[in-house]
């Protein structure tokens, strides 16, 4: 990505000192006042989220920087953070914040303020407008890019801070926040943020790190993830110039009879990476995944019996799982298997009608999901060696971001507090070996911090990375929390972590 000095990355250091009328507090005595404050502040909290959705930061397009970080800092200040210091890094702007409540325990937060690209033509309403619409049978939802991934849950968490302070209550824990603006391109520079001495020092005091999340499915069921898959994002580029065969510029397609095609060269290379059905990785010497344990298989079996297969297929707009696997086996495959996925293919003419050319260049955008104990560096090295061995060494492999998978013990204080909090809402949460998606939790779970890390939050949304992404604001399903309920879940979680 082309960069200019104007878009130099910065990190905003924020500190917050909270005061309260009393040094004594408990979830039981404080809850009613805080809940009343949440209801009172509903409209302003929703408006805050709408405004944030309107502030777009897309790393892949170099759009919305450094404004996105500045806006993130403003949100923090509005929630009570008092001091900010800008720190230059090599990455896009990040935010490091600390909240000192003079509490006995400290909890880490991971935020992202960037969002995925979007095509407005594919949406039912403008993706940056954050329009609130009726969506039967869910209730009122907010439609917008970032609504559920991840600004909605993060805004609900910030609303919890506003409500605690507005109710005149003392924060039960200290907080350390790390927010980045490159999550959607594989978080290539988050180590530079987290491994700064002052950030490491703050995080080392934490009992764990969590990311605000909308954990409920369409039935209101909650699964607690004990980790996440890792990921590598990259481009495979085939060009006539680099190959030494085919044209160095687009030429008339009639010449295909005597000139090699870089596009076909790329297709043939892609074909060697997977089985004929595209579902089994065939890369030579590729890292092997760690098999699921008996305990993990039992978790998957329990979840498969509880969560609706029909609702899952409806949500994902699919009719069949790979190889027509039954629900439990499809879930087991989801949790245990690495993947090689084609995100997009770009080459030649893609406009209306036809254009008889032989393209000089073709690109495949790829993501590769990793499970424990696979390492991103090993997977990338195996891919490069495989292509070279198979006669495709000329194809460029440009990694744009990525990181290792994460794992957290179910017995950690972070996870046990989640289970206890969900129980307060009448939910017996299910344990899930790992989120099939990815986030850069490895910087917290790996050396030198080795902290528990995960996701938490009630509420529901869907459509991340897709058109009409949504987040429930007012739920008509008593099993699913709306925005205010999600906000209260964060309040209860902080009090639970303080125990």
Task: Give the label of every model feature segment.
Residues 125, 172, 205, 227-233, ...:
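Short, solvent-exposed loop/turn segments at the edges of secondary structure
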Residues 27-147, 166-173, 366:
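Acidic/His- and Gly-rich active-site-bordering loop/insert found
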Residues 9-23:
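Bacterial N-terminal signal peptides
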Residues 1-11:
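Bacterial N-terminal signal peptides that target proteins for export
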Residues 198-201, 206-263, 271, 376-422:
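Metal-dependent peptidase/peptidase-like ectodomains
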Residues 141, 146-227, 498:
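Acidic/histidine-rich catalytic neighborhood of metal-dependent amide-processing enzymes
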Residues 234-310:
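Polar, glycine-rich mid-to-C-terminal structural blocks
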Residues 187, 218-219, 282-361, 369-382, ...:
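An extended, acidic, His-containing surface patch that forms the Zn2+-binding/catalytic region
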């Amino acid at each position: 990505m082309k960069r200019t000095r104007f878009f130099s990355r910065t990190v905003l250091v924020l500190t917050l000192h909270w005061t309260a009328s009393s040094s004594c507090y408990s979830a039981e005595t404080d809850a009613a006042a805080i809940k009343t404050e949440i209801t009172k502040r509903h409209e302003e909290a929703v408006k805050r989220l709408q405004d944030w959705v309107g502030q777009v930061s897309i790393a892949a397009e170099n759009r919305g920087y450094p404004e996105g970080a500045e806006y993130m800092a403003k949100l923090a200040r509005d929630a009570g953070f008092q001091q900010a210091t800008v720190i230059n890094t090599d990455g896009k702007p990040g935010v490091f914040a600390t909240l000192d409540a003079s509490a006995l325990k400290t909890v880490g937060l991971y935020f992202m303020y960037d969002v995925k690209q979007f095509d407005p033509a594919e949406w039912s309403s403008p993706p940056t407008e954050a329009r609130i619409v009726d969506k039967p049978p869910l209730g009122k939802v907010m439609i917008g890019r970032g609504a559920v991934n991840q600004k909605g849950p993060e805004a609900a968490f910030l609303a919890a801070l506003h409500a605690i302070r507005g109710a005149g209550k003392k924060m039960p824990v200290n907080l350390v926040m790390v927010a980045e603006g490159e999550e959607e391109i594989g978080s290539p520079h988050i180590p530079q943020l987290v491994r700064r001495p002052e950030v490491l020092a703050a995080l080392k005091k934490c009992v764990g790190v969590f990311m605000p999340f909308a954990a409920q499915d369409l039935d209101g069921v909650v699964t607690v993830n004990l980790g996440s898959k890792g990921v590598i994002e990259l481009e495979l580029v085939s060009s006539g110039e680099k190959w030494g065969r085919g044209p160095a510029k687009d030429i008339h397609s009639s010449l295909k009879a005597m000139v090699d095609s870089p596009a076909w060269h790329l297709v043939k290379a892609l074909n060697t990476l997977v089985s004929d059905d595209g579902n089994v990785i065939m890369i030579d010497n590729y890292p092997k995944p760690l098999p699921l344990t008996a305990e993990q298989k039992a978790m998957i079996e329990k979840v498969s019996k509880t969560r609706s297969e029909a609702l899952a297929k409806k949500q994902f707009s699919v009719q069949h799982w790979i190889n027509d696997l039954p629900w439990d086996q499809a879930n087991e495959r989801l949790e245990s298997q690495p993947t090689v996925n084609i995100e997009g293919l770009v080459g030649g003419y893609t406009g209306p009608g036809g254009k008889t050319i032989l393209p000089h260049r073709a690109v495949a955008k790829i993501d590769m999901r990793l499970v424990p104990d696979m390492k991103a560096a090993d997977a990338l090295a195996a891919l490069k060696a495989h292509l070279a061995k198979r006669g495709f060494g000329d194809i460029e492999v440009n990694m744009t971001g990525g990181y290792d998978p994460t794992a957290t013990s179910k017995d950690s204080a972070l996870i046990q507090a989640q289970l206890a909090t969900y129980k307060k809402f009448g939910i017996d949460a299910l344990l899930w070996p790992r989120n099939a998606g990815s986030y850069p939790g490895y910087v917290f779970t790996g050396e030198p911090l080795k902290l528990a890390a995960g996701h938490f939050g009630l509420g529901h949304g869907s459509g991340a990375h897709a058109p009409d992404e949504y987040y429930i604001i007012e739920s008509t399903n008593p099993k699913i929390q709306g925005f205010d309920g999600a906000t209260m879940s964060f309040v209860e979680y902080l009090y639970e972590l303080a125990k």
